Amino acid sequence: MGNEVAVFVTSEFNRTLDPAAGNGSDHAWGSHWMVMGGQVNGAKMYGDKFPSLVLGGVDDAHDGKRGYWVPQMSSDQVAADLLLWLGLPPEKLTEVMPNLKNFAKKSVGFMNG
């Protein structure tokens, strides 16, 4: 049964690295995903790179000093892997998820089978 089940966990937002005026952190771009199951091509981090965590560094976007990460992949690309694994034909991906037309790589590749 382990090869027939995938558990997908996500967060809908990210946080800035630098606290806001009230000592909390502001909403930022991006999110985090975890996928578990027998068909997951696991023990890897997916994406082009892990961003620099330096305030004002090369990966700090927006105003360049708060610690905003720019996402490395779309949630649509992540969902595409799960949809393909569930049996959606590849030629139907952009019909089901029209935003995928904006990306050269349509899926991430974390599912086997």
Show the residue positions of the predicted features.
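Feature marks hydrolase-like catalytic cores characterized by long aromatic- and Gly/Pro-rich stretches
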Residues: 1-113
